[in-house]
Design a protein with these regions (language model features):
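Extended hydrophobic packing segments that form well-structured cores
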Residues: 96-124
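Shared catalytic-loop signature of beta/alpha-barrel
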Residues: 1-87, 91-94
Length: 124
């Protein structure tokens, strides 16, 4: 009501997912506030936001940390989009456009537990 913000930067994971972020965007749009979603530094969250961004009238820019998304993201997830020259392409695959590469994931077994019951890191 007081127009204290010109741009909102909600995080899809903390906002409650795609539907909740869409609701936030609709309220922002009614107040002439643009959206610049915060990237959760997760490829799944990034793809969800990128897909949602395309549907937002008040979308301004998407935070995308290309330096975090290195080779392993592109080997364990088929369909994860790469940023090129400041842009990303939308996938036309179903859902978020991602598919787990189970063969690649199997090459990397889970790490053993490295914390004690009190949370102290041990054995590394």
């Amino acid at each position: 009501e007081k127009h204290a913000a010109d741009v909102l930067q909600p995080d899809i994971a903390n906002a409650g997912g795609i539907t909740e972020l869409k609701k936030i965007a609709a309220i922002a749009e009614s107040k002439h506030i643009t959206m610049a979603p915060h990237n959760v530094c997760s490829p799944v969250g990034a793809m969800a936001e990128i897909q949602l961004d395309e549907s937002l009238i008040n979308f301004e820019i998407q935070e995308y940390h290309a330096e975090f998304y290195t080779g392993h993201y592109f080997t364990v997830l088929d369909g994860f989009t790469r940023q090129k020259d400041g842009y990303v392409d939308l996938s036309d695959a179903p859902g978020l456009g991602l598919e787990l590469n189970e063969r690649e994931i199997a090459k990397h077994p889970p790490l053993k537990k490295i914390t004690s019951s009190g949370g102290t890191v041990r054995g590394i």
